[in-house]
Amino acid sequence: MAAMIFAQIRQEDSLRDIDMALNAHASKLYHIGIEQSPKSTLADANERRNYRIYEDFAKSLMQRARRQYAHTKLAVEVDNAVYALDASTIDLCLSLYPWAKFRQTKGAIKLHTMIDLRGNIPAFLTITDGKVHDVKAAPQIPIEAEGIYVIDRAYIDFDWLWTIEQTGAFFVSRLKRSIKWTRIVSHRVDKSLGLRSDQEILLFSKKSKAKYPKRMRKISFRDDTQNRILVFLTNNFVLPSETIAALYKARWEIELFFKWIKQNLKVKSFYGTSSNAVKTQIWIAMIVYLVLAILKERYKLENGLSQLLHFLEVNLFERKLLISIFQPNPRKVNVEDKIKYKQLKLFDF
């Protein structure tokens, strides 16, 4: 695992590159807990060592990170735990990854993810073929009483929403246009806040109503930044209308999470072609993300995760205290030093 974490931090492109980089630092590998391993050993470990080892370790880090960020303030003023759900597709070549079915001529995998918006820490992640619909992974997600689950329209399945309701939790989603409903009550709204309506509704069709028989709340909100009306669906009748709209806006954080992972870690190209190798690499990428998040909160660092990752990369083989990597003390240079170590001109020979 240490060698693969090394590869993630340095963004190595292939097993050969990992092997060459490790060989170049052979005398220093002991200090970071890595044994010198040939490319064939790394390839064999990728194929044969069960990815669930790394999955279990990542999940233990998820729990630790969430505990550390438990008291972090949300952008939206609510006391509940707030989670955002979404799925992100990673394209693969079907001829190289025939197990990753997506379309007839295209392969892909999908990361079904739920993040805790306090710290943007993954609270749930599973990896499937690209053809698995987002909502199919939803029943695997543990529902927490009083938790708020912010979802997009792909997750509207009334059986699952009823499970959330029965657990004593809440959902916030966009309303699908195809859903038929009947208005029961309308409440006054402050239109100066962008609100257009706040209504209590019941599902109209017998099939949908059998799955979700209770009232829900429908809120219309005008988004001036995009010049469109957004219609939200929730089972929370306590929070103000504008708070419901703000909660859905906060769902954007999971899009930023996926963007960060894809830009800063190695999750779009892989060191092996088997399902085990791909899942191993993704879970190790999650481990790196979680370690960075834990260090950021532990040392109260103001730097972004991208900066912290870069600090690790350039100091990987330095024998320093961890905190000194992230909070370096610049050496003060006095006047005598400036004269002694005067910068030479490029062509002054």
Mark where each language-model region is.
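Short active-site-adjacent helix-start/loop capping segments
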Residues: Q11-S14, A26-H31, D44, L92-C93
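A short glycine/small-residue-enriched secondary-structure motif
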Residues: D17-S27, I32-S40
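Single, function-defining residue in the core of a domain
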Residues: M1-D17, A21, R49, I53-S60, ...
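A glycine- and small-aliphatic-rich helix-loop capping segment at beta-alpha/alpha-beta transitions
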Residues: A100
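Major-groove recognition helix of helix-turn-helix-like DNA-binding domains
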Residues: I32-R49, K59
